[in-house]
From Swiss-Prot:
It comes from the Bacteria. Keywords: Amino-acid biosynthesis, Arginine biosynthesis, ATP-binding, Cytoplasm, Kinase, Nucleotide-binding, Transferase. It is an enzyme of class 2 (transferase). This is Acetylglutamate kinase. The lineage of its organism: Bacteria, Pseudomonadati, Pseudomonadota, Betaproteobacteria, Rhodocyclales. Its EC number is 2.7.2.8. The gene is argB. It comes from Azoarcus sp. (strain BH72). The keyword Kinase applies. Belongs to the acetylglutamate kinase family. ArgB subfamily. CDD domains: AAK_NAGK-C.
Length: 300
């Protein structure tokens, strides 16, 4: 069924029921911060992009404070291919030499960030695009990545990939108070002005901790976290996550996502969700209805 015919089939009574269901959640989350990691198909499908922008604007209009952190992997790969480079990943992190860093900053801080800002503004919001270099609000240092199943100190050089050292929340708080919607590209700055590519899931998780967010919502291209049989796991504890990593169920790009989600849950973020970004209006379904659309990460 098309989006148009689906909308036309919703009766006035059902619309009223949907609004009534949302009311207690609007009251509960009023003036609360919701950090959203935006990525995957939701960033490439035109209809899903429109749904995402309208969801974010609606959340702001009913009194929540959405903060968007975005990725841009497919767009980075496209530009790398144009300059004759191929992306390389280690444990879900993009290996970033100097030339790749230029491409990453151009794509994330320019093309992708401004497209998201424009989408939200066209939907009626007031979005402001940022990177961690703005006001130096995301400070970082070179990430020394520990090899899996190797002795401590056995590290992999992944180039200009950054590890967050500090986040100054004052800029984001200032924008929230002014009814703006921050849209953040995951680029950090070093003490000597170095530029660092930081995994967007990691930035979203750390930002949620610093802002004392009510929720962290990570969009992905799957229904959530799946077991080896492809079944959705609606809730995960740290012990279960360790088991899934050990048996290889969780790997690649899901590793930083899960790690970020678990750290946030352990450090004060009240609820953390990995949801299906391919579902229309997935944010509203997760935040303002009784029916979640993914996996909830528990701190214990």
């Amino acid at each position: 069924m098309s989006a148009a015919s689906s909308t036309e089939s919703v009766t006035p009574a059902l619309k009223a029921e949907i609004l009534a269901e949302a009311l207690p959640y609007i009251k509960r989350f009023f003036d609360k911060t919701i950090v959203i990691k935006y990525g995957g198909n939701a960033m490439t499908d035109p209809h899903l992009k429109d749904c995402f922008a309208r969801d974010v604007v609606l959340l702001k209009l009913v009194g929540l404070n959405p903060v968007v952190v975005h990725g841009g992997g497919p767009q980075i790969e496209t530009l790398l291919a144009k300059v004759g480079k191929k992306g390389e990943f280690v444990q879900g992190m993009r290996v970033t030499d100097a030339e790749t860093m230029e491409v990453v900053e151009m794509v994330l801080g320019g093309q992708v960030n401004k497209e998201i800002v424009n989408l939200i503004n066209q939907a009626g919001g007031k979005a402001v695009g940022l990177t961690g270099k703005d006001a130096s609000f995301i400070r970082a240092k070179k990430l020394l990545m520990q090899k899996l199943d190797a002795p401590a100190g056995d590290v992999i050089d992944v180039g200009q990939v950054g590890e967050i050292t500090t986040i100054d929340p004052s800029l984001i708080s200032f924008l929230d108070q002014g009814d703006f919607i921050p849209v953040i590209a995951p680029i950090g700055v070093g003490d000597n002005g170095e530029t660092y590519n930081i995994n967007a899931d990691v930035v979203a998780g750390k930002l949620a901790e610093i802002l004392k967010a009510e929720k962290l919502v990570l969009l992905t291209n799957t229904p959530g976290v799946l077991d080896k049989a492809g079944n959705l796991l609606t809730g995960l504890t740290p012990r279960q996550i360790d088991d899934l990593v050990a048996d290889g169920t969780l790997s690649g790009g899901m590793l930083p996502k899960i790690g970020s989600a678990l750290d946030a849950a352990r450090n004060g973020v009240k609820s953390v969700h990995i949801i299906d970004g391919r579902v229309e209006h997935c944010l509203l379904l997760e935040i303002l209805t009784d029916h979640g659309v993914g996996t909830m990460i528990k701190s214990k």
